[in-house]
Structures are given as C-alpha cells and as structure tokens.
Amino acid sequence: LGNFQQFTQNQFDITADLRASSIEAFAQDEWRFRPNITVSYGMRFSRYGQPYDVSGRLTNFDPKHFDPSQAFQILGSAGTRIAGTGNPFDGLIVNSQNPVAGMTVSPFGKAIARTPNNFGPRVGIAWDPFKKGTTSVRAGYGIYFDQVSFNPWESIVSTNPPFQARAVINPTTLDNPLAGNPVVSLAVQDLYGIDTNFKTPYVQHWSLDLQHKFGSKTLVSAGYFGSKGTHLTGLLDLNLLPPGFALTQTCRTNSATPATFGPCQTAGQVFTSSTQELILNQIRPFRGYGAVRYLATAFDSNYHSLQIQAQRRFARASQINLAYTWSRNMTDSQNEFLSVPQDSNNFRGEYSRAVFDRRHVLSVNYIYELPYHQNQTGAVGKLLGGWQISGITSYFTGIGFSPATSSNDPAGLGLLGSSPAGARPDFLCDPNVNAPHLVTQWFNTACFANPPAGVNRVGNAGRNTILGPPTTRFDATLAKSIRLSESKSLQLRWEVFNIFNHTNFTTFSSTNITSGTYGQINNTRDPRTMQLGAKIIF
C-alpha cells in the first residue's frame, strides 16, 4: 500500500502574462446620389500586434527551423527517444528577449511575424424605386477582420520547452515521492505551434434585400444574405503521416538487441492501439516529437441564406411578426482550437456543413391587448382592463453531428496516441433517410462502418452528416397592468416557457460506432417552467 509505479511533476507552474497592441480607425460618409438613392461607404483600418509574453517565455514550433539531422533517434518499437541523440529544442524558436542555449532566436523578435495592416471597405445603397416611401431595395458589401484571442498563445506558454519540463521518478512511495533520481521523460513530447506567417482572419458580407409596405400596417421583406470567411484559424497535427506512407518505409521492429527490421506497416494491417503505433515514431515528419498541434490560418467558410420577415400591426400595441431563414453554412474548420482534421495532409477533405448550421429557422412572436376597458374606470374596468397576451413560437432544424470510430487506423496515420485528430468511419448510406427517430436509435446506425482492412485510407464519411433532433418551442406570457396614477402602473406577469411540455431532444450519448450507446439520445432541453413577476412602471 502506498507504492507508486511512477511519480511525475512539471518543472514549473507557469502563468501566461501576455500582451498585444492594436490600432483601429474608421471613417464613414453618406452621399445622396439622387432624391431616391442614398449611398453610404466607409473604411476600417485594423492593425493587430504580435502577442508576446512579458517574461519572454513564449516559444513557438516553426517547421522551417526543424533540422532532421538534429532530431532524436527513436528506440525501435518502444517509440521513445534515445537519450543524448538529439536537440530537445529542434524546430523551436524563442523570443529574442530571453534567448536559450541550443534554441533558435526568433527572426521576428516574437513568436510570429508581424501581421499586415488590414483595410476593410464597406459600401451600401438604399433605393426607393417608386419614390413613394413604400418600397425599398437595399444592398451592401463589407470586409470585417477578426482579432484572434490569446488562447493558443497561452497553450504554448504552458506546454512547450524549454520553460516547461517534466521530471519522472519511478518507482516511488507515497510517504517519500522524491526518493530516487528524477529523470527527464524520454517519451516523445507534444508541441504547440502557430503559423509564423499568421494572417488576420476576415469575413466578407454581402446582402440584397427588398422591402415593401402594404397599406399602413403591414410590412414584408425578403432578402439574400451571404458571407465568405478567409484565413480562418484551425488546428492541424503536423506530425501525422500521409495515408499509406508507413507501408513503404522500413522500421526497427523491436527495442532489444539484436535489432530487427521490417515494414513499418504490413500489408492489410490495421493499427488498433496507441501501443501498436509507437513504431511509427521512427518515421514521423518531425521525429522525436509526438502530436504537433499547429494553429494555421488556412481554413475557409461560406454562408448563403434566404431571409423573409413579415410584420402586421393592429390596434393599440397588438402586432404579429414572422421571421423565416433558410440557410446553408459550409466550412473545412470544425473548431478553431479544439478539433483537428482526421488527415491534416488533406484538410480540404473536411469541407462539410458547419457545426452550428441549421437549414430552417422559423420564429413567430405576437402581442395582443384585449380591447376592453382600456381606461380602467370603475371596479369592472379595473378587473377586465389592461390584459395582454404575448408569446414566441419557434422551430428550427437540428445541427449536424460527426460519426466517429476509435482504435482504428488502417491508413497508418499515427493518430491513436496523443494526437487530437479523430478518425471517422466509411459512409454506406444516408443515416437521415427513413431514420427511426427513437431515443434508443435516432438515426440509421447501419450507415457507417470501419474502412475494410488493406484500403490504407481514412474513412470517407463527412463531418456533421448526422442530422440532430429539431426543436419546437411555445412560450407565452399573460400580463395584467393596473393603473395606479397617470404616470404609474403595476404589471403582474405569468410567464410560461415550453407551454405544452414538448420534449426536445438535443445531443447523442455517442456517435462512435464502437460505443455501446451509439446513436442514442441522452439529453433534452428544458421542460415546462413557469414564473410569476411584478413590476412597477413609472
């Protein structure tokens, strides 16, 4: 009791102290070209400085500075570094304010090169074609730049050497964990990197909208709205192997003497565990390292939508509004900091619907004031006057979920260890057609299977091909206003959310084909809730 096989401790508990400067300016003007045509235009200037750590502890992995001749040798199938054979800082660059022996000083002074100046033009036009004030046509275009958060830089500070190292003592005991001689782990180390030629992400927005007023109380509009994202951020794992590469390479197949050699991957072999894939550490692009999480501004997106709105006003404050959107949002980046393509050598193969894409969104909201005893005179007037019913009814289709598989790497990518990349299965049929839509099986789970042995490729199922459950919701409020004086009133409110207590399913227990809960629903949105409120209006 109290004996440990291994005790591990990080050398430092580092807290990032990051800084960055930014300069922004904006100019806008409006030109009435004709009495019924107005043009507005502007320009926004943005310059975002390189983030840096005040203490100079920000290092970055730059593939251009990796020297294979300085890389660690790997101990055969054990997949560990051989002590004394390589430069532990190979490929790493460090801030010029805090140089470290054996490391390359950043040619940029900081972790990345200075980002360029950004100019974002905007232009819009409003046209009243009939000069009656009842019809308008609007169009617009603009470019909008985005300043990336500090999150990836904080990961670098807390992960990359030389300012973070790990001591391992093994074996040891609970009452004396530091007994013995600590050694630096020889396991390959994961790294974080940021593209040194970092480009500022930007989005182009454009729109064309037609609006018409029918009479004095009805307004209808319909328009096309689109956008395109460029240089969007996303993670890659630079140390994954190309599919089939391991088949053509020779590896040391043991870690003892005498050494034996053979193919790194045999014909028809499917890697099913991280232990089996340790042999691939000998042929990784950046030998001596594990996963290399690399933030690149190489991803794109596009969005197209039809948006329709209608409003009808009635007497007093009564009105009803309807809004409908049909849209399509596509991208090759799932999540800028968390997910990685299953094959970083072909991240364009990730192009699919965005994780937050909803094809149909319908919303109806209304307010109805009972037209009785508005002046609230007398006992009957105070009782029957001042009542109002309002509510929101909404419906939207589900978001997409990605199928997954585990312990399966027929392509020999080397993603079963510490790599953040996840594998997907093969696509056999559309899982949403004739889907059972049961809690125990929402979609057709037979539509996915592991790639067959010997194909030496990743699964061909796309991201977010499983359509999640839709949402239908009815919310309403019954309010009673009691006039206290000419300028004061008391409002009593009874608010009900999800009036019909309709069950709206949300997420799956698992979309991994190897899971025992594959395809099952495990969560719902809020049930019916009510609340009472009162407020004084003055």
PLM feature segments, named:
Residues 1-130, 337-341:
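Signature of Gram-negative outer-membrane beta-barrel scaffolds
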Residues 6, 61, 155-161, 534:
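Charge-dense, low-complexity polyampholytic segments
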Residues 19, 36-37, 48-50, 171-177, ...:
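Short, solvent-exposed micro-motifs at the edges of structured domains
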Residues 43-51, 55-56, 140-148, 225-228, ...:
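Short, solvent-exposed turn/loop segments enriched in Gly/Ser/Thr/Pro and often Arg
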Residues 125-129, 146, 150, 368-373:
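Short, well-ordered loop/turn and helix-capping segments at boundaries between secondary-structure elements
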Residues 134-171, 230-236, 390-397:
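Surface-exposed extracellular loop regions of Gram-negative outer-membrane beta-barrel proteins
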